[in-house]
Every structure is written in structure tokens, then in C-alpha cells.
Amino acid sequence: VSERVDRDGPRAWQRREVLRYAAATPVLFVAAATLTGPTACAQSLRLVDFTHRQVPADQIKAAGYDGALVYVSELRPGADFDFKPVTREYADSLRAAGLHVVSCYQYGKPGWPTPSDYTRGYDGGVADARTALRLHAAAGGPESAPIFFSIDEDIDLDTWKSVAADWLRGINSVLGVNRTGVYGHSRVCAWAVDDGVIGPSTSSGHWWAWQTRAWSAGKREPRAVLYQAVVVTGPDTGIPMGGTQVDENEVLAADFGQWDLDRT
């Protein structure tokens, strides 16, 4: 998720410096389903995510990336981003360029009049899932693809148990568990898998978990399908592209939630 502020609190700088030098673990893929679009079994696929400015598909491809995560959420009041929600035209341009597309959702954010989405509990999850499903379909997203819902802050286990897990259960009630994914730190990803509130990838041993390096203290959740290795936050400027800065994500499984994978 690319709409960043200095999110980590007083220890933000120290944690970023540790993470900056953490070594990434190579991952081997095993193909898990039949593809109807670009191949997804290579070892080094990378995706970008961004919100502030829409990056043309040809620039993503020219920079050597394999796809993008796109927002199926409305633009919150006061924000001036031009990439929420994703349009059918833009999604089609990505696919025409041979790029993978993955859906994600974030509306609220800490420090804004619209609070973090998960704070609204079960009923908020129901409402968010309905919006996400509508915008995903409008952009051409298939019925089999998951949507990753963001927990874009450093929550603890008590917060997870008291409100965040119920938010995801509300999402489950609309999308079904099998299409529900989550974005968050390593512990959020682990809790979501363990509590059964996100679905499994068709790649064995992986679930719809998109881990960010932020707040993860260098730890990796091995069951995730995506890892956000470069994050635009504070002094970390991300990857320059298309007149904006983007986050970079490593693909960890053959089925990482891409639209072009046939899961039937």
C-alpha cells in the first residue's frame, strides 16, 4: 500500500535502518493452476503498488516489473490521488501490456477523518467488502480472484482479537473466506491464517496474505503470497516511476491473487 506517512512512531528511523539491510530469502515456485494470461511461475516476479499518481502500463513494463496492485476502493475525502478507484480502462491497459493485476482495498487511514478501515469492526467489513466487490467487478476483475484488505498500521494481538479479526469476518460474509486477503505486518498475516479469516492460495502452503516489511522487525511470514520489500514512508522514497514513487513487492507463490489465473 503506497499512501504512506511516517507510520512507525518514535522508533521508526531505527527500524527502517535495520530493515534496509535485511537480506531477502530466495523463494522457489511450484506452478499450482492453469494460466490463461502471462506466466506466473518464474522465481523473480515483482509488482508495484501506488496511489498518488497513476503510472502508465508501458512505464511499469519498461522498468522491468511484472504487474501492479490496483485499488478497488473509493477516494477518501480530502485526498487528491488520481488512482482510486481503479478504472476498467487502466486495468485493461495493464493486461494488454502483459502485466499481472491484483486487487487491494484501503479507504480509511490513521490521522484522517476517515479512520482505519478495520476499526469499524464486523459491520464495517460488510460495507467495505460490498464496495470492493462492486469496484473490482467494474474494473473487470474475475469472480475467482481475491481482494487484499489493508491493516496499514502496527496493531497488537489485543487489537486483532477485539476488532480487526471481526472486520475480516464481516468481509468474509460478503466475499467468502476463499476470496478474502489481508495486507499487514508479519504478525497480522500469521494471525489471519491461524484464525481462518483469509483464504488459501492454490499454491500449497500459501494464503492470501500480503506482508509489508513495515513493523515486521525483519521477520517473514512464510505462508504469505506477496512481500512488500520497498515501502514509500518517511525518508524511504521508494522506486521513482511515472512522476511518483512506488512500492515494490516480491511474489512468493505461483498463485498470488492475479486476475489472469484460472482457478476453476
Where are these regions (language model features)?
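Active-site cleft segment of glycoside hydrolase catalytic domains centered on the general acid/base Glu
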Residues: 153-178
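N-terminal secretory signal peptides
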Residues: 1-13, 26-31
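Substrate-binding cleft of extracellular glycoside hydrolase catalytic domains
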Residues: 46, 50-55, 70-156
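Functionally critical loop-and-helix segments that line ligand-binding/catalytic clefts
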Residues: 44-53, 57-60, 189, 194-264
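Aromatic-lined carbohydrate-recognition surfaces of secreted/lumenal glycan-active proteins
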Residues: 177-191
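C-terminal segment of N-terminal export signals and the immediately downstream linker at the start
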Residues: 32-50
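Anion (oxyanion) recognition and catalysis
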Residues: 61, 95, 172, 176
